């Protein structure tokens, strides 16, 4: 069965006006500059690991400009760098180090669960040369590709990484500046779409199901295509509309 998304001129005008209202926001400008660049820096283990740590932390907790998560990700040097974690040989000690680091920062929910997921992901990447495959998948996206190719990479990381469902896998790719079409759909996006008049009432909890998630994302992408707006830009505009001018050049990290 095929579903045809119908987008009318009123919908298009609404999207264009909304994006225009946020285009001066520094968060939106940073998203445009990074994610719509024609060529992007190659992703290495260190950068991927840092963003994976950060995006795992954003699950089920606040991640706005003044949040504990954002403050943690702005730390320099990064407290849980790849080299630091790789230097711990014992798996249980690795879990303990991650959990203790998160606790000492303060304000991070579920430190033990996050630590366990990250340690398991480290092991998976180190075993069976999975790093080579993971980095190859990522670096296929350093030049513009189509929406289908982005989705295949998102599905790969969704299956590979512990603690990364449909939203977090796309959050990871977007945080690396690699995606234009595949976006992390959260309660902000569903609230905006429901108010916009999305044809089905959306439930943020149901987005944990990959099929439902991709159904909603298909509709979001169809709306963007008709409006000639990249999904990552509309996503940034929605995000900015909730946070106002809280994001600055110094604290923009996503």
PLM regions with names:
Residues 1-108:
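Structure-specific DNA junction-binding interface
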Residues 50-63, 117-124, 174-175, 233-244:
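Short, hydrophobic/amphipathic alpha-helical patches that form generic packing surfaces
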Residues 57, 147-201, 238:
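Catalytic DNA-binding helix-loop module of base-excision-repair DNA glycosylases/AP lyases
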Residues 59-69, 125-133, 179, 198-199, ...:
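Short helix-capping/linker segments at secondary-structure and domain boundaries
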Residues 65-83, 131-143, 186-192, 203-209, ...:
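Short alpha-helical "patches" and their helix-cap loops
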Residues 70, 112-119, 154, 166-174, ...:
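Short, well-structured alpha-helical segments
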Residues 79-160:
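Alpha-helical ds-nucleic-acid-binding substructure associated with the helix-hairpin-helix region
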Residues 207-254:
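A basic, often C-terminal nucleic-acid-binding module that engages the phosphate backbone, implemented
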């Amino acid at each position: 069965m095929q579903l045809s998304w119908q987008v009318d001129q009123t919908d298009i005008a609404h999207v264009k006006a909304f994006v225009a209202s946020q285009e001066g926001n520094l968060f939106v400008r940073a998203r445009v500059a990074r994610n719509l660049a024609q060529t992007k820096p190659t992703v290495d283990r260190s950068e991927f690991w840092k963003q994976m740590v950060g995006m795992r932390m954003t699950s089920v907790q606040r991640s706005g400009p003044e949040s504990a998560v954002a403050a943690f990700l702005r730390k320099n040097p990064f407290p849980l760098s790849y080299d630091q974690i790789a230097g711990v040989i014992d798996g249980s000690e690795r879990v303990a180090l991650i959990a203790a680091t998160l606790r000492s920062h303060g304000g991070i929910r579920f430190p033990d669960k996050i630590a366990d997921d990250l340690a398991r992901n480290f092991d998976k990447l180190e075993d069976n040369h999975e790093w080579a495959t993971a980095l190859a998948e990522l670096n296929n996206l350093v030049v513009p590709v189509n929406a289908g190719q982005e989705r295949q990479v998102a599905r790969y990381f969704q299956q590979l990484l512990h603690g990364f469902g449909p939203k977090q896998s796309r959050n990871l790719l977007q945080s690396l500046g690699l995606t234009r079409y595949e976006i992390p759909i959260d309660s902000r996006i569903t609230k905006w779409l429901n108010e916009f008049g999305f044809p089905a009432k959306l439930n943020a909890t149901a987005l944990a199901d990959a099929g439902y998630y991709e159904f909603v994302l298909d509709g979001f992408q169809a709306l963007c295509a008709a409006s000639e707006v990249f999904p990552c830009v509309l996503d940034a505009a929605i995000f900015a509309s909730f946070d106002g001018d809280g994001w600055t050049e110094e604290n923009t990290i996503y």
